[in-house]
Amino acid sequence: IKNGTIMNPATQTIISGDILIEDDKIIKIAASITPSESEEVIDASGLVIAPGLIDTHIHFRDPGFTYKEDIHTGSLSAAHGGVTTVICMANTSPTVDNVPVLEDILQRAKAEDIRIYQAASISHSLKGETLTDMKALKEAGACGFTDDGIPLKNAAFCYKAMEEAASLNVPISLHEEDPAFITNNGINHGDVSEKLGVYGSPSIAEESLVARDCMLALRSGADVVIQHISSGRSVELIRMFKAQGAKLHAEATPHHFTLTDEALLEHGTLAKMNPPLRTEADRLAIIEGLKDGTIDLIATDHAPHSAEEKAKPLTEEKRGSDRLFLLRSVPAGLSPHEQV
């Protein structure tokens, strides 16, 4: 493979160069390798060469919503985007809140060519009221816990869940959108929402829960993942609490550091998602968070819907999109390997 941009996690380097492969093994990486006449040459000019990517935030819609996607088609989409390991969220139907559902998913996942991990839900039926049997679910193969798609509104319940996760030494991941602030979710409250004639979701809906959960993380000692950050102020909060010793892991999506809410004016419902695309200032703050390590995870939050669902009016359609392909199409000048 010649003329590629080679990302090497083992050496934490990015170089332009060539890779020699023999018998399915990498033999040599160098700035330039002269091939023999018998060797196949792949020109990787303008392409990134990297190990298989890990996407820690995926919705394969299986079980329950397989008209949108299932484990097999989702796995194909992941591989096409260069992703070879995924973590699936628990908001399926039935919810991954018990061992039989978890075991069914993990068993079917073995047939796929990528590696699939499954998170279990924090609460039964994603209601935020009763903890699942986290110990049993971990022993059955759950890699972590999340009610992603729905926030944990009760602070005491959230703290209890963090304490349990800490005792089991597993991460707990949180969707941070307080519905009390929101009308017409999926659209940032601001100049664009005013043009569209809707109220939308102000950034305080995210920031208020991020502030709360950063403190709960600090006090509980749990490994807490703040999912799909969309607000610059959220980045500031996480930076501050990390400095105080909170075991926080912050996640950003490609769409939140490459697009703004202006995309709604051009793309309509295709640019509607939870949390919403926000302002240019928020986008730049997320990039700064990636640069300085405040944000330490890039994940797609791949969440496909059917074409019929996305074709509904702006205030009715489902929020979400197929995002695994975004990993192949981040605009030049904005990709993490160029800026971080």
Summary of predicted features, one role per range:
Residues L131-I298:
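Histidine/acidic residue-rich metal-binding segments in metalloenzymes
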Residues T5-G52:
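Histidine-rich, glycine-flanked metal-binding segment
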Residues L47-A109:
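Metal-associated gating/positioning segment near the N- to mid-region
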Residues D55-I58, V83-C88, R115-Y117, H189-V198:
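Gly-rich Lys/Arg/Thr-decorated short loops/hinges at beta-loop-alpha junctions or inter-strand turns
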Residues H59-K68, I87-V99, A119-L131, T146-F157, ...:
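Divalent metal-binding segments
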Residues Q107-I122:
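A glycine-rich helix N-cap at a beta->alpha junction
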Residues G4, I19, D24, G46, ...:
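Divalent metal-coordination and catalytic microenvironments
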Residues E206, E316-G333:
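Gly/Ser/Thr-rich active-site loops/lids in small-molecule metabolic enzymes
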